[in-house]
């Protein structure tokens, strides 16, 4: 029984895919149409990919909800995925640098996002000179440790075996 095709009898079903940069990590670009690889039932169902860096899947959900509220579709299938462990970490960091202003903040910079976040922390301390730097940096380190711990609880997380100690999280690199 083709449930998707039955649902879409009046063209009231659509698919929304959230993904940042599959073109680089898995050499696959047109992800909306790629759903037909999961099930041929998706042939003929309108689909599109939504990209907004770390918010790609959230944007896909918002787009689907907007289409339902506008009464354009009755059912929206939303899929979000990333596969980022297909390359070594420095190459992956370069790929992720494309979520920033690449020519200025990503190109040729090893692991650009930790460095960008560090610069943001430095700028925050400059902007708010009364902020207790030690307490602020301690809070950021604790957030990092909590994020790693949260990933360990998700059996599907690609990073569940990664580790970040408090000591590692408090280390501030000086290279740009």
Question: What kind of feature is each model-predicted range?
Answer:
Residues 1-4, 19:
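N-terminal signal-anchor module of multipass membrane proteins
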Residues 23-37:
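A structural motif shared across PLP-dependent enzymes of the aminotransferase-like
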Residues 5-9, 26, 39-176:
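Acyl-thioester C-C bond-transforming condensing/cleaving domain
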């Amino acid at each position: 029984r083709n449930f998707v095709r039955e649902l879409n009898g009046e063209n009231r079903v659509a698919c929304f895919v959230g993904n940042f940069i599959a073109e680089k990590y898995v050499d696959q670009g047109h992800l909306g149409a790629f759903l037909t690889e999961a099930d041929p039932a998706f042939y003929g169902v309108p689909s599109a990919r939504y990209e907004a860096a770390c918010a790609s899947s959230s944007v896909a959900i918002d787009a689907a909800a907007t289409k339902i509220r506008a009464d354009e579709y009755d059912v929206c299938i939303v899929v979000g995925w990333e596969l980022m462990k297909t390359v070594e970490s420095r190459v992956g960091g370069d790929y992720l640098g494309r979520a920033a202003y690449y020519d200025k903040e990503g190109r040729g910079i090893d692991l650009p996002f930790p460095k960008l976040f560090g610069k943001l922390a430095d700028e925050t301390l400059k902007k708010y000179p009364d902020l207790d730097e030690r307490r602020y940096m301690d809070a950021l380190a604790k957030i990092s440790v909590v994020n790693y711990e949260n990933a360990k609880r998700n059996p599907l997380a690609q990073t569940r075996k990664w580790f970040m100690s408090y000591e590692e999280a408090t280390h501030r690199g000086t290279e740009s």
